[in-house]
Design a protein with these regions (language model features):
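Short, small-residue-biased leader/transition segments that mark boundaries at the very start
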Residues: 1-8
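Catalytic nucleophile-loop/oxyanion-hole region of alpha/beta-hydrolase
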Residues: 9-39, 169-174
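C-terminal catalytic histidine-bearing segment of alpha/beta-hydrolase fold enzymes
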Residues: 141-144, 148-190
Length: 190
């Protein structure tokens, strides 16, 4: 499993959070022997906007291939943002003023899903008020349709009680999701 703390807020310009994921995977794969892990078939676990960024790393177009890294064995995403919708121009002004280049917050994850996308386990909570403010129907449901349309092996859960920022889901309907997701990953990589 790969996890990292990504640059956020005022440190998130110039695609810094995506570069954080790249550096974490590079470091772990370069030191796999030292850490006693395999450099291939790794899983990435991430949440919320980090789920969108990690999800983009799993794509052919802007992710792992562009950095000469092995493809993830699975994406394990808790309430990932699919699109920042109306927040895109605000992020551009706050994070990258005057920059017209492609940035992670301008990308809609579902637009980058291809048949070669890694197996994915993703979930959302019906009472996730953060994603509600970002048009819930443009988040999980659209990502789910893209995975299904591209025949990507995946599992999708929508929980009644799993508000935003619950991570492992302790004390919510999502409790235990991480164990189920790890089992899904292990099944995919054999």
């Amino acid at each position: 499993l790969v996890g990292s703390e990504m640059c956020i807020r005022d440190r998130a310009s110039n695609n810094a959070p995506l570069q954080d994921v790249v550096r974490a995977v590079q470091y772990i794969t370069e030191h796999a022997g030292q850490f006693g892990v395999q450099a291939e078939d790794y899983a990435i676990v991430s949440y919320s906007s980090g789920g969108q960024i990690a999800g983009l790393f799993g794509t052919d177009a802007v992710g792992y291939k562009n950095y000469g890294l092995p493809k993830p064995g699975a994406m394990l995403l808790g309430y990932p943002v699919n699109t920042f919708l109306e927040f895109k121009p605000v992020y551009n002004i706050l994070l990258d003023p005057g920059v017209c280049k492609q940035r992670y917050y301008k990308m809609t994850l579902s637009d980058y899903i291809t048949p070669d996308y890694p197996p994915t386990y993703h979930w959302y909570g019906k009472n996730d008020m953060t994603l509600m403010t970002m048009c819930w129907s443009a988040q999980g449901p659209v990502l789910e349709k893209a995975l299904a349309r591209n025949h990507v092996t995946h599992i999708y859960h929508v929980y009644d009680d799993a508000p935003h920022a619950v991570a492992a889901g302790k004390g919510t309907d999502a409790e235990g999701w991480l164990n189920e997701a790890v089992a899904f990953w292990e099944e995919q990589v054999g």
